[in-house]
Regions:
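Auxiliary tRNA-acceptor-end handling modules of aminoacyl-tRNA synthetases
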Residues: 1-32, 193, 208-216
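Positively charged, Gly/Ser-enriched RNA/tRNA-binding surfaces
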Residues: 2-3, 28-48, 57-58, 93-106, ...
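Glycine-rich, mobile lid/loop segments that gate access to catalytic sites or pores
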Residues: 172-186
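Polyanion/phosphate-binding surface patch
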Residues: 55-87
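A short alpha->loop->secondary-structure connector
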Residues: 109, 168, 192
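Short secondary-structure boundary/capping segments
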Residues: 67-69, 188-191, 448-449
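Acidic, His- and aromatic-enriched active-site or binding-groove loops in soluble protein domains
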Residues: 71-83, 189-219, 317-321
Length: 493
């Protein structure tokens, strides 16, 4: 380490944020809040109730594993309390729910249907689109053993995505079950945990590497374009063929996929039980009116199968976007969930059936922004301070607007007319209210509709014509100001 690295930071160098903890401006904050409002509105419509837990949980209560994390307890932020117990920031909204259910016991009626929204934290290496702090919005049913509860989660998740603006064909929820895959692994003789994990990792790369690349990873191994060699799962040719037949059994309809799976899943009892799970879910999805295009049965979905105990589902955006490099790519996963019947057993020894669905709010907000689906911000009406001898008048006008329920502010800077207009434009103001000495004397105000003014200004050829026309600008008595401004705001809304 150099002397420079050990020197204390001073001045501007001190102004830095920790890696993976993004600052958010109003646009993104507003978009996230709108998504939370919309998604939780769907959850409430389906009969779920709100539950809020603290940001910290005792580290030993969180458990020794994370979803999709190969390093137990590697992904949390922890501090030691003054009683020497370790507390961790929650890494998801499910582990606190499990603790709540175990602690509340029978005082919580079952089935217990709850939703929650809030930030979670992961102590992982940050990167593009990968943060250490992000928002999730979950719904869970605790105490419902039937697979109709899983189907409900899936159908409700699809409705939530449609509610935020996704159309059929722009997203898909893929469904699989752990027991079905276990049956396939059993039929090909994958007994050891290492072999099973290698197979899961290989199948997870099917979209990226295709059948040929996955076949290499299921067999002896794969040499990539950079020359790096990845050791394979060590399956023989017949076993590789069987696993690929299972992973590629997806078809146009859920019924066709199930028919293909009945042939590819093998003869193990575990595989048959998994197939029965998916058949029950498919029947329930039909009853719930979940469109075929929104929800598919996809045996290649393996992410999370080591965490969940039964069905697993992954929500993915299908719309392609163009990156800064000019290449097109899919945004990918924006949510998912599954059945986790063992989570509460860590506390009580009792197997409590539970299933849930989570929408990644931060990821979805970023995805919608990339796709150009921005939320229009309602900027404040700005009251310009044009009479330096009577600065309190602008305060009085802004107060009148706010008391009428309109969002408004008086300009507090030191700029002149041009600078104040630029400020109002930057704030996204629908209108400005101007009160100079002439208006004060006449008991009037001048109101400029910034949106209409900009539209009309495009047709004006000269500065002289612009000054004469004053596009989008009206003068009204002060007692008519509120209604005049309200009409402008509502017309733009």
């Amino acid at each position: 380490m150099s002397d420079k690295d050990t020197q204390p930071l001073t001045g501007k160098d001190l102004a830095r944020k920790p890696r993976g903890f993004p600052d958010k401006r109003e646009g993104l904050i507003h978009a996230q809040a709108k998504l939370v409002e919309t998604v939780t509105g769907v959850y409430r419509k389906w009969g779920f109730e709100a539950l809020e837990t603290g940001a910290f949980e005792y580290a030993d209560a969180l458990g020794k594993f994370l979803p999709d994390d190969d390093r137990p307890n590697a992904g949390v932020f922890a501090i030691q309390d003054d009683d020497e117990q370790w507390m961790s920031l929650r890494y998801d909204l499910t582990a606190p729910l499990a603790r709540f259910i175990a602690e509340a016991g029978q005082t919580v009626g079952r089935p217990f249907r709850r939703y929650a929204a809030g930030p979670v934290w992961r102590n992982e290496k940050p990167g593009p689109g990968r943060f250490r702090e992000f928002w999730q919005c979950d719904a869970d049913t605790v105490g419902a053993p039937g697979f109709h509860a899983d189907a409900e989660m899936i159908a409700m998740g699809a409705e939530a995505l449609r509610a935020v603006g996704m159309e059929t064909g722009e997203f898909v929820i893929r469904v699989n079950t752990r027991r079905l895959l276990n049956g396939v692994l059993e039929s090909v003789g994958a007994a050891s945990a290492d072999t099973r994990l290698a197979i899961l990792r290989a199948l997870d790369k099917l979209d990226r590497l295709g059948a040929s690349g996955v076949a290499d990873l299921l067999g002896k191994g794969r040499l990539d374009d950079s020359g790096d060699f990845t050791k394979g799962a060590g399956l023989g040719d017949a076993e590789v063929k069987a696993v690929l037949a299972f992973a590629e059994a997806g078809a146009k309809t859920r019924a066709e996929t199930l028919a293909n799976l009945s042939k590819a899943a093998g003869n193990s009892e575990e595989g048959k039980a998994g197939l029965a799970e998916l058949e029950a879910i498919a029947v329930a999805l039909e009853a719930l009116g979940a469109p075929e295009g929104d929800v598919v049965i996809d045996p290649s979905v393996v992410r999370g199968l080591e965490y969940y105990t039964g069905p697993v589902y992954e929500a993915e955006l299908l719309r392609e976007v163009t990156g800064e490099d000019g290449k097109t790519y899919r945004i990918g996963s924006i949510g998912g969930g599954g059945r986790y019947d063992d989570l509460v057993a860590r506390f009580t020894g009792e197997t409590v059936p539970a299933t849930g669905f989570s929408v990644g709010i931060s990821r979805l907000a970023s995805a919608l922004a990339i796709m150009g689906e921005t939320v229009k911000l309602d900027g404040p009406v700005v009251v310009l301070n044009l009479d330096k001898d009577s600065p309190a008048v602008a305060l009085e006008i802004a107060t009148m607007l706010r008391r009428a329920g309109l969002r408004a502010e008086a300009y507090m800077g030191g700029s002149g007319m041009k600078g104040q207009m630029k400020y109002a434009d930057r704030r996204g103001a629908p209108a400005v209210v101007m009160v100079g000495s002439n208006e004060i004397e006449a008991g009037t105000v001048t109101i400029k509709d910034l949106e209409m003014g900009a539209m009309k200004a495009k047709a004006i050829q000269s500065n002289e014509e612009y000054r004469e026309a004053r596009p989008g600008q009206i003068e009204v008595p002060r007692d008519q100001m509120v209604e005049a401004v309200r009409r402008i705001v509502e017309a733009q809304g």
